[in-house]
């Protein structure tokens, strides 16, 4: 069994977030994610900043359920799946916003990138000697497997169930450690 592969640029819309420039930015102040807010598989929403966005920028830089947010610099490839954890969220320049087309289940593409990023498979695409970057042009050429949608859903469901078990165990361990300290 082999799956068709396609370049990311043919199976998803993606862009870098908006450049932070207080002198030029106009519009409504909205919360945005920066590189520091993206963790492996989750978001840290405890310290959100705001930037001005104009109406015509909302579609491009705004997040929708199922978007993958990936770090472009610092620790390129670090990513998480947006599930509308916060309303009217936007993205800043150091992040790629990846929105899969209908041929890809968002969770499947997320787990694909999580695997590629955590195992170092994206490293050959990085540029920069001191601070690494994953440029849009290189991201566009990544070959993405496109199995039948039912297979994508099954794979994502199994991996999500394991993630839930891991998170549940983390919470239990934290409770046990807290109880042991008392």
Give, region by region, the residue ranges found by the protein language model:
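A short beta-sheet element
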Residues: 34-35, 52-116, 135
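A generic structural signal for short beta-strands and their flanking turns/coil linkers
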Residues: 29, 47, 92-94
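Short glycine-enriched loops at secondary-structure junctions
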Residues: 38, 75-76, 127-128
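A short glycine-rich beta-alpha junction/loop motif
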Residues: 2, 89-96, 127-156
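Sequence-specific dsDNA recognition surfaces
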Residues: 5-24, 36-68, 85
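Non-catalytic DNA-recognition/assembly elements of restriction-modification systems
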Residues: 1-18, 141-182
């Amino acid at each position: 069994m082999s799956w068709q592969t396609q370049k990311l640029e043919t199976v998803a819309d993606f862009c870098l977030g908006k450049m932070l420039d207080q002198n030029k930015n106009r519009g409504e102040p909205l919360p945005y994610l920066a590189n520091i807010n993206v963790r492996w598989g989750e978001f840290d929403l405890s310290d959100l900043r705001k930037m001005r966005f104009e109406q015509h920028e909302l579609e491009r830089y705004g997040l929708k359920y199922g978007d993958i947010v990936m770090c472009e610099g610092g620790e390129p490839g670090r990513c998480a799946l947006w599930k509308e954890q916060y309303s009217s969220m936007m993205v800043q320049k150091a992040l790629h916003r990846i929105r899969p087309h209908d041929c890809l289940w968002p969770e499947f593409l997320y787990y694909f990138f999580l695997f590629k990023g955590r195992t170092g498979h994206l490293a050959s695409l990085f540029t920069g000697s001191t601070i690494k970057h994953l440029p849009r042009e290189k991201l566009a050429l990544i070959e993405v497997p496109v199995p039948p949608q039912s297979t994508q859903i099954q794979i994502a469901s199994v991996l999500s169930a394991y993630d839930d078990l891991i998170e549940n165990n983390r919470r239990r361990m934290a409770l046990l450690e807290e109880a042991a300290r008392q």
